């Protein structure tokens, strides 16, 4: 029998946000005390707590610490000269060290450690993953001025010797817009599928069944008309549409990157199809 409407509705509920807000405020307080050599950085949430897609059990809070007085871009050397851009003597490595020092001074050395991509901070509230980044400017081919760019952020991964570029502000803005376009069904639907995934993992499904970011981006590509009515309607409409869709054309919620590909920040079509099969089996096998 299918999953009951009451169960799907429970799965759509948002998790608590108060402690995440206090975690964010704690990180901000730590950074406010520091004397920054190149101006105070911008501090903001990203991830499920920012996007209102957090569910019960979500723990780590993603906090972005972004330096805007220094930036990277996609311009050629000649284009940079034309705009008068010069190389900064204050690098991402310098900024990373300053952020690490600010957090260590506030929380203590035992509470701050380096992760692969983030600084892991144990606050008195929730653990925080602090992304230390600088502004990234993506200029279009026919740019009109130095201010004609799409804002992202970028950070270095030392263990892999590469830079990562992401667009968390666009991810948030596009998700908020889609939520409005679907009469506020989009974000509850994300939470419904996240909880369904968690339920399946608890029943023995693979731990990497559908990472939250990829799941959110997958659902972003579903037409607005497939959301709404009842949660049963939405579950079936979304899954049935995705099973027939050409996944190779899917974009991330930020609108800038392909969802599927070979880079570490991309998903695989095979794993997305696997997720859809698990959702199918959940729907048809509920209660058995």
Swiss-Prot record:
Residues the entry annotates as binding ATP: 46-48, 194, 212, 265
Pfam family, one: NTP_transf_2
Cofactor names: Mg(2+)
Binding positions for Mg(2+) per the UniProt entry: 60, 62, 129
GO molecular function: ATP binding; metal ion binding; nucleotidyltransferase activity
Group of enzyme by EC: transferase
Record carries keyword Phosphoprotein: no
EC number: 2.7.7.-
Keywords, comma-separated and alphabetical: Antiviral defense, ATP-binding, Magnesium, Metal-binding, Nucleotide metabolism, Nucleotide-binding, Nucleotidyltransferase, Plasmid, Transferase
Keyword Cytoplasm among UniProt keywords: no
Function, as annotated: Cyclic nucleotide synthase (second messenger synthase) of a CBASS antivirus system. CBASS (cyclic oligonucleotide-based antiphage signaling system) provides immunity against bacteriophage. The CD-NTase protein synthesizes cyclic nucleotides in response to infection; these serve as specific second messenger signals. The signals activate a diverse range of effectors, leading to bacterial cell death and thus abortive phage infection. A type I-B(UU) CBASS system. Cyclic dinucleotide synthase that catalyzes the synthesis of 3'3'-cyclic UMP-AMP (cUMP-AMP) from UTP and ATP, a second messenger for cell signal transduction.
Family: Belongs to the CD-NTase family. E01 subfamily.
Protein name per the record: Cyclic UMP-AMP synthase
Source organism phylogeny: Bacteria, Pseudomonadati, Rhodothermota, Rhodothermia, Rhodothermales
Gene symbol of the encoding locus: cdnE
């Amino acid at each position: 029998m299918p999953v009951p409407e009451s169960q799907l509705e429970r799965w759509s509920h948002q998790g608590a946000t108060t402690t995440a807000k206090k975690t964010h405020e704690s990180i901000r307080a730590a950074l406010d005390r520091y004397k920054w050599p190149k101006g105070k950085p911008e501090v903001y949430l990203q991830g499920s707590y920012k996007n209102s897609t957090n569910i019960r059990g979500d723990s780590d809070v993603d906090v972005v610490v972004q330096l805007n007085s220094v930036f990277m871009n996609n311009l050629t050397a000649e284009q940079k000269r034309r705009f008068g851009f010069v190389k900064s003597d204050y690098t991402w490595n310098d900024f990373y060290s300053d952020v690490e020092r600010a957090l260590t001074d506030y929380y203590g050395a035992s509470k701050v450690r380096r992760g692969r991509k983030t600084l892991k901070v144990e606050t008195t509230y929730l653990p925080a993953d602090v992304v230390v980044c600088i502004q990234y400017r993506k200029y279009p081919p026919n740019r009109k001025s130095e201010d004609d760019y799409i804002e992202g952020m970028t950070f270095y991964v030392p263990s892999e010797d590469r830079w990562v570029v992401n667009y968390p502000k666009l991810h948030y803005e596009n998700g908020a817009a889609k939520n409005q376009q679907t009469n506020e069904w989009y974000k509850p639907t994300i939470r419904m599928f996240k909880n369904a995934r968690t339920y399946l993992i608890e029943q023995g499904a693979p731990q990497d069944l559908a990472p939250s970011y990829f799941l959110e981006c997958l659902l972003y590509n579903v037409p607005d008309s497939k959301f709404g009515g009842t949660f049963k309607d939405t579950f079936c409409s979304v899954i049935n549409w995705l099973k027939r869709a050409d996944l190779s054309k899917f974009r991330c919620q930020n609108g800038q990157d392909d969802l599927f590909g070979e880079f570490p920040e991309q998903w695989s079509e095979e794993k997305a199809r696997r997720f859809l099969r698990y959702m199918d089996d959940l729907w048809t096998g509920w209660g058995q």
